[in-house]
Amino acid sequence: MKTKLLSTLIALLSLTMNVFGQAKKPTLMILPSDNWCEQRFFMTEFDNQGTKQKVPNYKQVFQEDVEIGQVISKIGSVMIDRGFPLKDAEQELKSIEARKAEDNMTSSTTSGSSISESPLDKLQNKAKADIVIQIWWKVNKTEQGKSVSFILEAFDAYTSKRIASSTGNGTPNNTDIIPVLLQNAILANIDPFAAQLQSHFDDMFNNGREVLLTVKKWNSWDKNLETEIDGKEITDYVNEWLQKNTVKGRFNMSSATENIIRFEQVRIPLFDANNNSIDARQFAKGLQKYFKAAPFNFEVKLMTRGLGEAIIVIGEK
């Protein structure tokens, strides 16, 4: 009897350890901060539908800076030691350059209306990391030797919201190279930072990933979002679909007119039935299919900006 009870307890303990050992960790991607790139003139202009914006030129960073590869490798090893899977930004950039099959510019085949994405949007779409970590550092010279000051910030790759940060200064010495000085400085401050990352991901795991969703109409369409179908406005159908398909029915309609509806804090599942990550595009495909079927039979265009914003446009494709 005791032997059987002991065997049962061991089996339960083993199962419990296995469950905790398989706890999901967010996938990370490490990049230099915008400010670091600006200070070193690694910037380029991006034409955002007629508006010029300065954005980091990550390709140039990895090609020309002698320290960034080592720095990212050192920080990456610190995060991997804590169980976080990592996406290699440099390799993802090379993959984007190698393919160049499309320029990530989407347009209506009827009217030519378009939506553009920044280089970071394209990189995040390719890598599909959950969290982007940005690093800034500066080398200080003291009587005791060189030291580094650093700022480590983490952003939700889907919403661009800051979710964790850490700052600090390393111990001066004249023997270690900059990447090692930086690694040691970060190690002394990393545990609270890692805890913030895990807390954010745990919230997503329980309450869904946050994305943005916009539903709008083409100007050429003969209906609008207040048009009634079988006694209900199109806007009402959108709300009902979101109630059924978001996690715990959580979303916020921030604005609604006859031409456009904007939803914020739309909580979508992290994974599908096959345990693959779901982004805003995959989620919005369900709404696209919904409106393409009876009783609507609409032409529907699906566009995205980055991983976390989907735009459904009704009336053309």
Label each PLM-derived region with a short phrase:
Residues 1-24:
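Bacterial Sec-dependent N-terminal signal peptides
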Residues 22-42, 161-250, 305-306:
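C-terminal/domain-edge helix-coil "capping" segments
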Residues 23-25, 66, 70, 74, ...:
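Extracytoplasmic
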Residues 38-41, 96-99, 142-147, 222-223:
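Extracytoplasmic/secreted cell-surface and envelope-processing proteins
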Residues 44-126, 132, 232-293:
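N-terminal segment of the mature soluble domain
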Residues 92-110, 155-178:
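Short, flexible helix-coil linker/hinge segments at the edges of structured domains or between repeats
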Residues 131-175, 305-317:
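Amphipathic beta-strand/beta-sheet edge segments enriched in Tyr/Trp
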Residues 286-317:
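C-terminal basic regulatory modules in eukaryotic proteins
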